Every structure is written in C-alpha cells, then in structure tokens.
C-alpha cells in the first residue's frame, strides 16, 4: 500500500490501552504518517501507548465520540482527507485503501465501510445485528437513502465535506448525524465492503446497545424535521388525530349505551383531531417548501 501523505487517520479513544497500540502500529507500518488519536480522558494508558507507537495524541476538551470527532477535524486536522475508525482493533488497515479510493478518484466525498459485507463470527451479537438493521431501515424510510450500514465507525471523508455539516451529537450518534447530513446536503456518498472483526479478548466495549440505540433512533427522528418534514409532522399529526378519534369513539359509545356524557373528554378529543389535522397540513406545506428550496 502506498503512503497517503494527505490523509489523516483519526482514532477517537476512551480506555483502549489493550488495542490502540496495535491499531496505530498497523496504520503507521502501512504508510500513514499522520495518525491522530483523540483521547476522551481515558483512565488507562491509552494516550501513552498510542504515543509510543508514533501517533499524534491530543486530549479532547469535552466528552463523547461526537465531540471528539468535531474538535479533531476542525482544530487538529490539516489534511484534505480523513480516515476515521475506532481504536478497538475491529477494523482492518487492509480495507483502508479501498475506503480512500472513491475520495482520491473524486467519485465521492464521504465513504462508509459496510461491516455486514464480511461480518466475522463473534464480531456482533445477534441483538446488535437486529438493532443495526432496524436503524438502517428506519434511516432509509425517513431520509430516503439506503447506505446499508449507517452506524459503521469506519469512515473516509474530505475535510471540506465535513465542515459543511451541522453536527451536535456528543456520543455514538455522530455516525448517524453524518449520514443524515450527507443525505440532506447532497454530499456524494459511497459504500464499500469491509471486514469487521471481533474485539480482542481483554478489551471492553464502550457501547451500551439499548441506551445508545434509543439515542440514535431519537436523533434519526429529530433530524427528519428538516430533511423530511412530511414524515416528521405527518407522524405527529396521525398520532394526534388517531388519539382524538379514539377518545371520541369512547365518548360516543358511553353516551349511546349508558347515557353518560364526558364533556371534558369530548373537548380533548376535538382538540386532538384539530391539532392532528393542522400538523398534517403543516407537514405537507413544509415538504413543499423544502422541495422548492432544493430545486433552486
């Protein structure tokens, strides 16, 4: 593999002392001179191990993977291209050249490594596989793009395209935000197959599947407000309308069968129906405005 002089290998870390040394050494040996490790206040020797293997190590000013990536690219990366991966040795340097090829050829501005193309045994639990596929389908439904593996931590992108994005997630939601921003801003995105390895024994994951999965789903939905307003406001409108109709049906049955009137519940049902219809109309209008804006 030839050296990539204008590529920065970005590795956000937190308590990865068991694996970061091998990760840095592999990329340095492969010809990547600029390996940047952004450490989030590890309790172990992660920074020292990374530095000993030749990495450039900085301590992030905040906390969380998302904040680390934003700070690194904006303040510590001077290269035109960034290759981002986790420091847990689950991603291979053997896939690096294929990740970077679409960028260097000018065919894409953002590249996602598809872990499901070669998912090694033990690399991901069945529960996590189910959650990943569910989130990918949700992304395709809400944002109209099928990129196969939006949660992949192996990314390659131009620094210029990254600076176009509006990012705010501090934790693992950074990958989701980046995928949404690519879809929203029309950033050319390529997906390449990669190998995803199990974590080496003795290393612990920082991922909390239920908590982080919930955060990612909320982020997907929140981002739909500006990227797919018809879905965002429409789903709220349908929920409000259906709730109002359900309450109205109960009030009507009670009045017809038992002669009991529920004035307050009737008002609530009417309010729910009116709000729901207004949200649906607002969603249609917002979607029309967004379409006109994209066409200009």
Predicted ranges, named:
Residues 16-19, 42, 65:
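Donor nucleotide-sugar binding loop of glycosyltransferases
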Residues 89-91:
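Acidic metal-phosphate-binding loop of nucleotide-sugar-dependent transferases
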Residues 39-47:
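A conserved acidic beta->alpha catalytic loop
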Residues 1-26:
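N-proximal low-complexity "stem/linker" segments adjacent to membrane-targeting elements
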Residues 40, 85-87:
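Active-site acidic Asp-centered loop
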Residues 25-33:
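Short, acidic, metal-binding catalytic loop of nucleotide-sugar glycosyltransferases
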Residues 58-76, 81-84, 93-172, 176, ...:
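Acceptor/aglycone-binding surface of glycosyltransferases and processive sugar-polymer synthases
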Residues 1-2, 177-296:
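Hydrophobic helical membrane-anchoring modules
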């Amino acid at each position: 593999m030839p050296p990539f002089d204008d590529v920065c290998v970005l590795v956000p870390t937190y308590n990865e002392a068991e694996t970061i040394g091998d990760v840095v050494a592999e990329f340095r040996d492969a010809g990547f001179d600029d390996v940047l490790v952004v450490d989030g206040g590890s309790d172990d020797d992660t920074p020292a191990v990374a530095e000993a293997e030749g990495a450039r190590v900085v301590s992030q000013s905040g906390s969380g993977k998302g904040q680390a990536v934003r700070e690194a690219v904006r303040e510590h990366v001077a290269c035109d291209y960034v290759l981002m991966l986790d420091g847990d040795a689950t991603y291979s340097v053997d896939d690096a050249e294929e990740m970077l090829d679409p960028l260097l050829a000018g065919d894409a501005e953002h590249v996602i490594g598809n872990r499901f193309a070669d998912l090694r045994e033990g690399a991901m639990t069945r529960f996590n596989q189910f959650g990943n596929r569910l989130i990918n389908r949700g992304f395709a439904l809400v944002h109209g793009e099928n990129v196969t593996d939006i949660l992949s931590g192996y990314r390659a992108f131009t620094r210029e395209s990254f600076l176009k994005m509006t990012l705010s997630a501090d934790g693992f939601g950074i990958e989701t935000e980046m995928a949404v921003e690519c879809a929203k801003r029309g950033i050319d995105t390529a997906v390449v197959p990669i190998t995803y390895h199990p974590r080496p024994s003795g290393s612990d994951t920082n991922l909390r599947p239920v908590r982080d999965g919930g955060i990612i789903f909320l982020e997907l939905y929140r981002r739909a407000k500006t990227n797919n307003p018809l879905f965002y406001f429409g789903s709220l409108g349908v929920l409000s309308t259906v709730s109002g109709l359900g309450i109205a049906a109960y009030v009507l049955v009670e009045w017809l069968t038992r002669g009991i009137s529920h004035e307050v519940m009737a008002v609530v049902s009417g309010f729910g129906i009116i709000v729901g219809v207004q949200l649906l109309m607002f969603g249609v209008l917002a979607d029309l405005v967004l379409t006109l804006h994209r066409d200009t």
